[in-house]
Amino acid sequence: MQSQKIRIRLKAYDHKLLDVSVGEIVETAKRTGARVAGPIPLPTVINKYCVLRGPHVDKKSRDQFEIRTHKRLIDILDPTQQTVDALMKLDLSAGVDVEIKL
């Protein structure tokens, strides 16, 4: 597994939950002897939704809602077999989406 790189992308709606998960991954990787680059904050995607407030006529009265998707990127350089095993056993929060590329 030498001279390889594991790239981990994390997405979540709650940035505090995301930072806790990133901290767990970085701590696990450093404990097993791998080098870690990151966490790199990626741009936050903001989806805005405009909804009519009333059920009938009044088009001028609207509500706006938004969903913010926060993203982080972590590169694990020179991972060992212990690093891969520890990352597979790691239990992250339910609100965090994880994408792993080798």
UniProtKB/Swiss-Prot annotation:
Cellular component, GO, one term: ribosome
Domain of life: Bacteria
Any one GO BP annotation for this protein: translation
Classification via PROSITE patterns: RIBOSOMAL_S10 (PS00361)
GO molecular function: structural constituent of ribosome; tRNA binding
Keyword list, A-Z: Ribonucleoprotein, Ribosomal protein
NCBIfam families given in the database record: PRK00596.1, rpsJ_bact
Subunit note: Part of the 30S ribosomal subunit.
Stated family: Belongs to the universal ribosomal protein uS10 family.
Function: Involved in the binding of tRNA to the ribosomes.
Stated name of the protein: Small ribosomal subunit protein uS10
Gene from which this protein is expressed: rpsJ
